[in-house]
Structure formats: C-alpha cells, structure tokens
C-alpha cells in the first residue's frame, strides 16, 4: 500500500497520532484532522503496480508499509525486513480500529506487565532489555453468522415426597425438542499466516463499536500486513469459535430438568456477511539471556500476551511454600483431632 501525507506547513511526512486521533507532523508540530487534510497533500493508491512488499530475511514474513520506507524491523522476529518484489492483489480493508495507545504508553504498559510476573526472573522483571516496539495492523476477517439448531433430548424430572413412614421418588419422563435460531455478529478470525492463532485469540476482545471506515491515513507511521487467508478459508475457524456459545445456549433452554440426555443435535451455520478489517497490535521484541522473546499488545486496550521466561528458583520456592503450607495445615488438623506432631 502506497501512502504519503505531506504537512501543509513544511512538507514533511505526517503520521497518525494515537493520542489525538489526528495526523501529526514531527517536524513543525502541526496537527490536522484526517477528514480536513487538503487532498493535494494526500497521495494514496491501491495499485498492484505500486504497492511495496517487504520480506524478512530471517522468518520470511511479508509486510506492507509506506512506499518511501526502505528498511524496518520485522514485527514477528525482530530481524531486518528489506524491500522485495512488488505485490499483486487488492489490499483495501473495509474497516479499521485505529491505535489508541501510543508507543510510549505501550512501553510503559509492557514494563508494568513484566514486573507483575511472580515466577519470572528478576532480570526479566526489570524490563530494561526491550529491543523494539513496533506498531502493526494485523489482518482479520469479521464474520456475521447465523446458526439454525435442532435438538432432541430425553429429559427427566425427579421429585421426592413422604408418605407415612416412606420416602417416595417420582420420576417423570419427557421428550423435548428445541428449534433455535441464533445470530452472532463480528466474530473475528485473524488472517495472518505468521501470527499464531492462539496468540491473536488471547488479544481479544477489541471494542468493535470503535470500528471505523478504512482510511489510509490511519496507517501513516505504522506497518500493515496483508491477509494470507480468504474468508472462505477461515469460515471453519469462525464456526469453531462460536461452537461453545451455541452449546451453552442449548443447555440454558433445558433448565428445570433433573437430567438431560441429548440424543440428536443438528447445527447449520451460514456466513451472512464477512468483511476484511485491520486491528492494532504492538509487537514487542525483548532480549533476555541471549534469547529473543516476542510479545503482543492489544493496541486499543493495552492487554499483553506472550510467554515470559520462568525462574526455576522461584518455581521451586513456590512449590516448597505450597508443600510446607499443606504440611502445616495437616498437622494443625491432626492437633485439633487429638493427634500430635
């Protein structure tokens, strides 16, 4: 994607400011609303002949950024990403959630998160080895799904009552049928091959009411990755994400029974609508003991996900504390019951 925003004052490049929600010039300090920036200062095209592709030498990740960028840091592995061949394909998303957390705020939030690790090494908790923090828009498909559900079940309702000296149990048997229609809106599924699904799922939720019509200005100063999977390819994952919610709703419709034995369940889910969006993520590359650790932060909420290193000493001390506490509790119970140490 080729995008260039020139400052009306000094002609320098402008970037999206997550704190003010406007375009900001780092040279002269001018700020402009995205909608009010003069058109003659905007050069943006979705042309197959002009979009640039940057490919990381280390991990092979394919990144998209402004045309004037010649080198950057790979958000996936922290390595250098270089300009490669030109792209093909239409890369314009329908919606975007802009960054609301600045790079400085992201760094502060990450340092705070590091210090909360009860089982992480002290050297890691100091959070003084941040190699890079890169703002990146990750491609997602949003799905609006409709599920038609038919369920047949054998149910019982048991109640007891006294009759003279006897306690009687009465069991009623029912055949139950449920015909359910459910709608699920804006189910997100990440469309990046390089991003782990588990990592992206943990970054949720985003506030999807903040989705905005896509404008190229939101990408100024950030990296955007193209999608690797179509909505058709990701439809099975979208259905999988709502399966537990469907089961939970089915269960709620059988309240009041003592037992429920589902003997037949049919679920038909269709894709009512799907659209391509970009969601903000801060990728953090952190060096610790000659190893690089990659973390992701929700660029809207500040939620951090990733696997920090674990201190074996702290883990051993933690288990020793649990074992010691359990031993002491058992001895106290023994004393109260008349036993002794």
Swiss-Prot record:
Residues passing through the membrane, by range:
315-337
Predominantly, its location class is membrane
Alphabetically list the UniProt keywords: Cell membrane, Membrane, Transmembrane, Transmembrane helix
Pfam families registered for this protein in UniProt: Zn_Ribbon_TF
Cellular component terms per the entry's GO annotation: plasma membrane
Where is this chain's protein located in or outside the cell?
A: Cell membrane
The UniProt entry lists membrane topology as: Single-pass membrane protein
InterPro entries tied to this protein: Znf_TFIIB
- Tell me yes or no: is ATP-binding among this UniProt entry's keywords: no
Q: Which domain of life is it from?
A: Bacteria
Keyword field contains Transmembrane helix: yes
Q: What is this protein called?
A: Uncharacterized protein YdjG
Organism, scientific name:
Bacillus subtilis (strain 168)
Q: Which gene carries the instructions for this protein? A: ydjG
């Amino acid at each position: 994607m080729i995008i260039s925003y020139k400052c009306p004052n000094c002609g320098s490049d402008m970037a999206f400011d997550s704190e003010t929600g406007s375009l900001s010039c780092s040279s002269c300090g001018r700020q402009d609303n995205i909608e009010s920036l003069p058109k003659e200062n905007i050069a943006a095209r979705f042309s197959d002949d002009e979009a640039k592709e940057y490919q990381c030498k280390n991990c092979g990740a394919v990144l998209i950024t402004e045309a004037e960028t010649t080198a950057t840091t790979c958000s996936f592995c922290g390595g250098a990403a270089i300009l490669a061949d030109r792209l093909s394909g239409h890369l314009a998303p329908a919606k975007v959630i802009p960054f609301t957390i600045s790079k400085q705020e992201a760094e502060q939030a990450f340092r705070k998160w590091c210090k909360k690790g009860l089982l992480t090494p002290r050297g890691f908790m100091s959070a003084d080895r941040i190699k890079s923090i890169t703002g990146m828009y990750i491609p997602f498909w949003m799905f609006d799904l409709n599920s038609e559900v038919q369920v047949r079940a054998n149910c019982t309702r048991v109640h007891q009552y006294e009759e003279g000296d006897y306690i009687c149990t009465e069991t009623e048997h029912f055949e139950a049928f449920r015909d359910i229609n459910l709608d699920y809106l804006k189910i997100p599924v990440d469309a990046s091959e390089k991003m782990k699904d588990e990592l992206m799922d943990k970054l949720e939720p985003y506030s999807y009411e903040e989705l905005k019509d896509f404008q190229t200005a939101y990408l100024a100063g950030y990296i955007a990755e193209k999608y690797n999977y179509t909505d058709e390819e990701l439809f099975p994952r979208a259905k999988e994400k709502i399966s537990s919610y469907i089961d939970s709703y089915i269960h709620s419709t059988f309240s009041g029974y003592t037992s429920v034995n589902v003997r037949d369940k049919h679920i038909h889910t269709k894709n009512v609508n799907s659209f391509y969006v970009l969601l903000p993520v801060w990728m953090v590359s952190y060096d610790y003991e000659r190893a690089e650790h990659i973390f992701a932060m929700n660029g809207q909420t500040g939620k951090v996900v990733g696997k920090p290193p674990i201190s074996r000493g702290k883990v051993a001390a933690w288990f020793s504390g649990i074992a010691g506490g359990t031993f002491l509790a058992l001895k106290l119970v023994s004393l109260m019951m008349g036993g002794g140490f």
